[in-house]
């Protein structure tokens, strides 16, 4: 098959190069005692995420959105950080459902109002929702 014949979007990976890059990064981080949780927003591949966790020593996976986290959890990954706030009743129900399944999912927040929403949703469902608080250190990102 020629490259122009591949239906897009498609993930095309040079496996040998990926293996070398993963080994180099994992080795460097291991030498320095750094725990790492790589972002899945580029590859969006549970298979690659599993490789990073089970073979390269990552402590989990970071997802941009709740939907990505659900895909990773459905594939057996259960240490997940969602880098963006999860808002809206339907999404909060989905987040709570992951916690009820036993998925170790943490959500980044930067708004106290959202923390209160998480607290109420968690209280109603009888679960906890771990959060990490994003602090604006002047870069306004």
Place the predicted regions along the sequence by residue.
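Generic N-terminal amphipathic, Lys/Arg-enriched alpha-helix
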Residues: 1-13
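N-proximal short alpha-helices
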Residues: 2, 21-25, 88
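Structured helix-beta-strand junction loops
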Residues: 9, 32, 101-102
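Generic structural signal for well-ordered, non-membrane alpha-helical segments
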Residues: 11-14, 22, 111, 115
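Short, surface-exposed alpha-helical recognition segments that flank or form part
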Residues: 13-16, 106
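N-terminal glycine-rich anion-binding loops that anchor highly charged ligand groups
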Residues: 17-50, 64
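Active-site-proximal beta-alpha core segment in soluble small-molecule metabolic enzymes
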Residues: 39-141
């Amino acid at each position: 098959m020629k490259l122009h014949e591949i239906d897009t979007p498609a993930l095309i990976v040079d496996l040998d190069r990926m293996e070398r890059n993963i080994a180099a990064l994992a080795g460097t981080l291991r030498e320095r005692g750094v725990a790492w949780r790589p972002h899945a927003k580029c590859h969006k591949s549970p298979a690659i995420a599993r490789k990073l966790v089970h073979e390269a020593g990552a402590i989990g996976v970071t997802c941009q959105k709740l939907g990505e986290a659900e895909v990773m959890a459905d594939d057996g990954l259960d240490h997940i950080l969602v880098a963006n706030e999860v808002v809206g009743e339907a999404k909060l129900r989905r987040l709570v459902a992951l916690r009820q399944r036993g998925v170790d999912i943490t959500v980044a927040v930067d708004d106290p109002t959202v923390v209160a929403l998480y607290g109420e949703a968690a209280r109603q469902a009888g679960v906890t929702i771990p959060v990490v608080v994003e602090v604006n250190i002047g870069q306004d990102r």
